Amino acid sequence: MNFPAPFAYPSKPHVRRHGPLGYSKYGQYRNWLRDEFTFRCVYCLRRETWLTLRRDYELDHFLPKSEHPDVERDYDNLVYACSECNGTKAAKYLPSPESVAYGKCLRVDENGKIQALNEHGMTIIEVLRLDAPEYNRLRYQIIETVAGLQSRPRVLELWLGYPDNLPNLSAEKKPKDNKRPQGIRESHYERKLRDELPEYY
């Protein structure tokens, strides 16, 4: 069986699956965004299952709310990010993962080093400092750990599987509206109920 690479960026631009509208606080979109971005940081690809504390992940305003207060609670301006990437990005601008495929911009080699494939990739790496030695080391440690676990699928699932607490979006506080209601059926929770969710991603 071929297992997914832990640091493979998406080969296509992200297409929003969900579209809840009308929450009074942007934090209420958290579980929608967890599902939207597959429980990992959109920038560095670190997964929830690799970090243990809820506060390790935040909701990043892609267009900074300090400069664009009108979209502070706009779901389509929010992405799921680890606290380190969110803090480093701050109010800086990056190529949108919905406009460009990050997999066409960035590549992580087997030694954990990240490479820019174009100018967008150079910008992402520079702004987020993704080529810092500690990032390279962390990626290498995880790549080697995953490689060493390929004969132990149950343990490997802890690293490459989905988190246990998949959000049931139908049970979330109902938003005022949802411009993509069909996305709930395609959520990871619903797919698991239908036995359509793969073991690894």
Q: Locations of the language-model features?
A:
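Short, charged surface segments at domain edges that flank catalytic/cofactor-binding sites
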Residues: 2-43, 68-73
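Alpha-helical interaction segments
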Residues: 13-19, 52, 96, 149, ...
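Short amphipathic alpha-helical surface micro-motifs
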Residues: 24, 39-44, 61-62, 85-90, ...
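Short cysteine-rich loop/turn motifs with clustered Cys
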Residues: 29-56, 82-85
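Short, Lys/Arg-enriched charge-dense amphipathic segments
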Residues: 72-84, 112-123
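Conserved, surface-exposed functional patches that form binding/active-site neighborhoods
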Residues: 89-161
